[in-house]
Amino acid sequence: MKILFDTNLWISFMIGKRLASIKDVLCRHDVEVYVCEQLLDEIRIVISRPKFDNIIPQETRRRFFEMVYDVCLFTDITVDAASPIRDVKDLYLLSMAESVPVDYIVSGDKDLTELGGHKGIPILTYNQLIAILHQNT
């Protein structure tokens, strides 16, 4: 199963909220999680905001990126997605999803989840993904 996580889920993972089980997803041998440099750049930009200084320690950030580089598969964006999406900054995620192609886009962003899917690729919440993974266990 090929998966793409949106930035907000990665940030939640670093903060250690209920999405801590994302580590379990990353360690499954039937799951491949894809990232691209643009996604990692967006994560770096978000966590560099002052409000995260006291929430995500530098050591957590360092370990996070080490884990991503160790566990995730990197891809280039080779497709320019066109979609009626409110936040055009998210278009690169849809382009990346098409480029791989992934089986699922997983996001906590209502703008994306309300789309329901993009070019046959379902856009799920994290809880929906976990339900699918439990069915496949």
Predicted regions and their residues:
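Residues that scaffold the ATP/ADP-binding catalytic core of kinase and kinase-like folds
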Residues: 12-13, 46, 55, 115, ...
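Hydrophobic/aromatic ligand-binding patch that stacks against planar heteroaromatic rings
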Residues: 25, 96, 115
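Short, well-structured N-terminal submotif of metal-dependent ribonuclease cores
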Residues: 1-35
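Acidic, PIN/NYN-like endoribonuclease modules and their adjacent C-terminal/linker elements
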Residues: 100-106, 110-137
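A secondary-structure boundary/capping signal
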Residues: 6-7, 35-36, 108-109, 125
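Active-site neighborhoods of divalent-metal-dependent phosphate/nucleic-acid chemistry enzymes
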Residues: 70-105, 110
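Residues at secondary-structure transition points
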Residues: 17, 34, 59, 84, ...
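PIN-domain endoribonuclease scaffold, especially VapC-family toxins
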Residues: 26-80
